[in-house]
């Protein structure tokens, strides 16, 4: 038994359903294929057109699983009662029968690299989405930038991974409204056009205590800040 989203196939359909911002989902009960993963005969499936994902703009994998799990249990019980598992088996799947393998999208296992922030291409909305779906995100840039933006050659600095435990979208682009005395959080300015501001609610710097990264990065910003940079002391342009 597994969650499906129409053309998704693979080990992580719930995560990819949310990452692709899909609005509908459902459940499939299938047999085990003798050779291939996730290609068994469909014994039961959520009817067309599927189920609306509750609160889809804010839904997490855990919440989606909690929504689907009791429905999946009910489907399994009904399948056992109807003995749909007994030969001759009937494929009752309604979606994808006329689709080629190329059209059926793969939902691969989530890897660590999926949480690696690509500042060149990820927008603020993409970062918030991945944070909600994947949990902690990370990069190797923020630590260096907290120092190198102040005129220091960043190539001479060691790489340090920063693990981000949470973000908030800063709705006001007026840097003057950011607190210069708050030592518990800082902001990152994205590269999209126009740039967006994300407040880091908590982070960990490689080699440091979990959740204590913000203070270390803010210490860098305070130590190396220059009055004529035009950058707010609590902001890093990544």
PLM-predicted stretches and their roles:
Residues 1-106:
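Donor/substrate-binding cores of folate-linked one-carbon enzymes
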Residues 62, 66-69, 110, 131, ...:
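N-terminal, helix-rich and Lys/Arg-enriched segments in bacterial and organellar proteins
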Residues 103-105, 112-238:
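An anion-binding loop in the catalytic cleft
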